[in-house]
Amino acid sequence: VVVKAGPALRGIYVKTARGIRAAARRVGLLARLDRAYQRRPSSVAGHLRTLFAIHDVDDLVHLDIPWWTYGAIRAVERRLVELDGSARVFEYGSGASTVWLGNRSGEVHSVEHHAGFAEVMRRVLTQADLDGTVQLHEVAVQQSPHPVTRSGRKGEDTVDYTDYVRCIEGVGGLFDVVVVDGRARVACCLAAVPFLAPDGIILFDDSQRPRYHEGIEGSGLEVQRIWGWVPSLPYPRQTAVLSRRAGG
């Protein structure tokens, strides 16, 4: 079952979660849930704590967790542990995951198209003491009557994400982990393949969305689809982990 939440419903949920979080803090429940989360993030109580962090990058950073399925988080963390903190990472779409990756990698490049959120992320990265590890690339989108690279989102028919997608080319080199969790995801995934290290992985979030299926399957990579609960959401989603085929 795929659950879709429109902007209005999502707004109501976020507002309600913030109100309940404030009440939970006053009565001491939030502190108890914090302790449960620290013991086991994916437990029922741990997941309940994350529901209060919806669309709150500071709270997600506090919880030290990205916004992917728990199974995908474990898969990426295993790869980062194998590389013993030396991983080179490229990320499409910044957020709490940028800090999470920065704390576990040697070098992170994250591209962000939204100027306002890029400013928020610069503050967050400085507070996390990650300015030396994470480089945030702010790349504005272009308006065009005939965009070359579309996002597929409603209301963005004249928005061109070509520069955003090609940011990885400007950085260059091979990456151990590539995260595709921003806009124009199919184009980003395909652009990242030539820059993927032989044992590297691509994390493609929200892979349950129909508009992503053809691009994922056409990447030429092995695809592991991980369905499950996601921090801060009351319903499950899917995150795909892509890797090179054996002998490929």
Regions found by a protein language model. Give the residues of each.
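Short, well-ordered alpha-helical scaffold segments within catalytic/effector domains
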Residues: 66-77, 95, 162-165, 186-189
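Internal catalytic-core helix/loop-beta-alpha segment
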Residues: 136-191
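Short, charged/polar micro-motifs that form catalytic or ligand-binding hotspots
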Residues: 62, 66, 87, 91, ...
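Conserved phosphate-coordination/catalytic loops
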Residues: 63-71, 155-159, 182-183, 233-236
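C-terminal substrate-binding/active-site "lid" region of AdoMet-derived donor-dependent transferases
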Residues: 168-172, 177, 182-248
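Membrane-proximal basic amphipathic "stem/tether" segments
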Residues: 1-64
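Short, basic, glycine/proline-bearing loop/turn elements
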Residues: 57-62, 82, 174-178
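SAM cofactor-binding core of SAM-dependent methyltransferases
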Residues: 70-145
